[in-house]
């Protein structure tokens, strides 16, 4: 029934591109509301019941919550554990809110499966990419990724963000980095891998990135970190600190297999 109130949702903006609305991907260094994490539990990724991983995640959550909000997703099985952790951390010291919510995922990589946020300077919207576990049936890291693939729109709708639907274009958050002023970086080894968008050319992928991220320039690095199982995500090897300045992982050891890559 038409209530007379016009709403904007992902269905209405599915055929509209962020760049057409004046949206861009901000730099990581820009002020933002908070950080999304997923509580680890997948046995194939986290040994010993994820005990050591959970200790490390707790340290990261504490560090982030000192300066911004944390949105912590946990499965129904681990929600109570994650909630108790959040309560303990916030009791021990003055922190920003740690908001624990239930979400079923296949693993704990929020950076890759979560929404990419874009802004026009006033409003923030999300982008939902296709996720296929870093390579799908070609060289993906696990056989079932349907829960991960639903996480981005779930989070956007839960938090009230309008979101653009970029599917079936496959992309992970860690595979792209922005300077916030129209330049993004990616690696050829990842975005041109056979398990992601094999039917698209480099030029076509470049245009996709410009259209969805509001970019004017796409920097293609040939490789990333040696043996990175994500097909060498750019965020592991190079990241913008500010426009015109990057931090780079490299080695001076000519015998190291990373030497020719960076």
Describe the function of each predicted region.
Residues 2-262:
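The feature marks the mature, well-folded catalytic cores of soluble enzymes
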């Amino acid at each position: 029934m038409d209530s007379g109130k016009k709403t904007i949702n992902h269905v209405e903006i599915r055929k509209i591109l962020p760049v057409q609305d004046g949206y861009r991907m901000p730099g990581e260094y820009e002020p933002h509301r908070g950080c999304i994490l997923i509580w680890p539990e997948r046995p194939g990724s986290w040994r010993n019941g994820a005990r050591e991983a959970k200790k490390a995640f707790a340290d990261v959550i504490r560090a982030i919550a000192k300066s911004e909000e944390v949105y912590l997703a946990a499965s129904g099985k681990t929600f109570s554990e994650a909630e108790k952790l959040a309560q303990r951390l916030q009791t021990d010291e003055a922190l920003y809110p740690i908001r624990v919510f239930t979400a079923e995922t296949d693993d704990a990589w929020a950076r890759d499966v979560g929404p990419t946020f874009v802004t026009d300077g006033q409003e923030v919207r999300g982008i939902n990419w296709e996720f296929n576990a870093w390579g799908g049936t070609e060289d993906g890291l696990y056989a079932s990724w349907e829960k991960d693939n639903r996480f981005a729109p779930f989070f956007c709708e839960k938090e009230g963000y309008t979101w653009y639907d970029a599917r079936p274009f496959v992309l992970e958050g860690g595979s792209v980095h922005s300077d916030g002023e129209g330049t993004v970086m990616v690696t050829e080894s990842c975005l041109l891998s056979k398990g992601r968008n094999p039917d698209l050319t480099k030029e076509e992928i470049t245009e996709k990135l410009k259209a969805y991220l509001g970019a004017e320039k796409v920097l293609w690095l040939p490789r990333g970190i040696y043996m990175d199982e994500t097909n060498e995500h750019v965020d592991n090897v190079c990241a913008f600190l500010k426009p015109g300045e990057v931090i780079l992982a490299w080695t001076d050891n000519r015998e190291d297999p990373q030497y020719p890559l960076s």
